Amino acid sequence: MAAPAPGAGAASGGAGCSGGGAGAGAGSGSGAAGAGGRLPSRVLELVFSYLELSELRSCALVCKHWYRCLHGDENSEVWRSLCARSLAEEALRTDILCNLPSYKAKIRAFQHAFSTNDCSRNVYIKKNGFTLHRNPIAQSTDGARTKIGFSEGRHAWEVWWEGPLGTVAVIGIATKRAPMQCQGYVALLGSDDQSWGWNLVDNNLLHNGEVNGSFPQCNNAPKYQIGERIRVILDMEDKTLAFERGYEFLGVAFRGLPKVCLYPAVSAVYGNTEVTLVYLGKPLDG
């Protein structure tokens, strides 16, 4: 079983492909950085609480004292203040981020959420920053990728539908080249060699336009229930994609993934349905 672990480094920012997702390393300086390095941690924390993520990332590289001050407590005032400034009130007030253990983890999840610039024209990302809404457009399948993809490391995220599935509702991964919109109602994820998907409606695994069997591999597998959180586990070391449901490990769905940048992705067909995706970080085996 996999569970999220707090990030060891700074929350990732920007868009594109991430490596192992470990974040910034400890400052290269051998000691304190002048007078600033000798400031008490509580004073540094107060100063850091006014900075933005990119500035905090630079501060973490100054010296080991600053790095420890930033990353010693993931619920410190630094991360709480940044969380309050960066995330929508709805995301913090509701249970969207209930499985994230710290303010820092919540910021990291936001950095890895759906991209507003890398989705079908028929969907939009709601103000909470984590939920996709599909407009009621006839004869169209619409998808979205996250802001950051992965070429290294192990990563976990949760996905759940908050509306009807329709005839096709697919979760999985995609390269940057995979299309995020097409005509008709089809399994967009898995329709070519650039994406891999699990259709929650009929439990089929899809890749390269073909059905790769049913999933999970058991008799009378239960159907997906609206609101049920599915955990997706991408292992770029073993080149596998696996799924969990309710902390039950369902098995490895895809093996032999290519060594390219892969993005969490979904595709939907039902009008006004909504899909939420939350990045959890590195999974722990248990």
UniProtKB/Swiss-Prot annotation:
Keywords (A to Z) from UniProt: Acetylation, Cell membrane, Cell projection, Developmental protein, Membrane, Neurogenesis, Nucleus, Postsynaptic cell membrane, Secreted, Synapse, Ubl conjugation pathway
Pfam families hit by this protein: F-box-like, SPRY
Record-linked InterPro entries: B30.2/SPRY (IPR001870), B30.2/SPRY_sf (IPR043136), ConA-like_dom_sf (IPR013320), F-box-like_dom_sf (IPR036047), F-box_dom (IPR001810), FBXO45-Fsn/SPSB_families (IPR050672), SPRY_dom (IPR003877), SPRY_FBXO45 (IPR035784)
Residues modified as N-acetylalanine: 2
Induction record: Down-regulated in response to DNA-damage. Induced upon influenza infection.
Pathway: Protein modification; protein ubiquitination
Localization (cell): Secreted; Postsynaptic cell membrane; Presynaptic cell membrane; Nucleus
Record domain B30.2/SPRY: where: 92-284
One record GO biological process: regulation of synaptic vesicle exocytosis
GO molecular function: ubiquitin-like ligase-substrate adaptor activity
UniProt similarity note: Belongs to the FBXO45/Fsn family.
Protein purpose: Component of E3 ubiquitin ligase complex consisting of FBXO45, MYCBP2 and SKP1. Functions in substrate recognition but also plays an important role in assembly of the complex. Required for normal neuromuscular synaptogenesis, axon pathfinding and neuronal migration. Regulates neuron migration during brain development through interaction with N-cadherin/CDH2 after secretion via a non-classical mechanism. Plays a role in the regulation of neurotransmission at mature neurons. May control synaptic activity by controlling UNC13A via ubiquitin dependent pathway.
Summary of subunit composition and partner proteins: Forms a complex with MYCBP2 and SKP1. Interacts with HEY1; leading to FBXO45 nuclear translocation. Interacts (via SPRY domain) with CDH2.
Protein name: F-box/SPRY domain-containing protein 1
Organism this protein belongs to: Homo sapiens (Human)
